[in-house]
Curated annotation (Swiss-Prot):
It is a peripheral membrane protein. Belongs to the UPF0161 family. Its main location: membrane. This is Putative membrane protein insertion efficiency factor. HAMAP family: UPF0161_YidD. InterPro entries: Membr_insert_effic_factor_YidD. It comes from Lactobacillus delbrueckii subsp. bulgaricus (strain ATCC 11842 / DSM 20081 / BCRC 10696 / JCM 1002 / NBRC 13953 / NCIMB 11778 / NCTC 12712 / WDCM 00102 / Lb 14). One of its GO terms (cellular component) is plasma membrane. Keywords: Cell membrane, Membrane.
Length: 95
């Protein structure tokens, strides 16, 4: 079930997302967050975390770095600064 859900998100990333304007206010993007949440938490909790993240992604939220926490939560990662340097380094040095 987890792999099917990940395949659906990857389909969205490759077929649908490129034709839409950029709108995610977070890093990683909501679709990448969903995949990581599914991998870390399994299909049910991962889906709930991903949907909660999508609901947080709106013009009234400041956005920013919000990696998937190691423990299940429907709230924003309480300590994104712990990951920020690692994420920024990965983003700019992976090319």
């Amino acid at each position: 079930m987890r792999q099917i859900m990940i395949l659906l998100v990857r389909f969205y990333q490759r077929a649908i997302s490129p034709i839409l304007p950029d709108s995610c206010c977070f890093y990683p993007t909501c679709s990448s967050y969903m995949i990581t949440a599914l991998e870390k938490q399994g299909p049910l909790l991962g889906l709930l975390m991903g949907l909660a993240r999508i609901l947080r992604c709106n013009p009234f939220n400041r956005g920013g770095v919000d990696p998937v926490p190691d423990k299940f939560t429907l709230l924003r990662n309480p300590h994104p600064e712990e990951y920020e340097d690692e994420i920024i380094a990965r983003k700019f040095h992976s090319h």
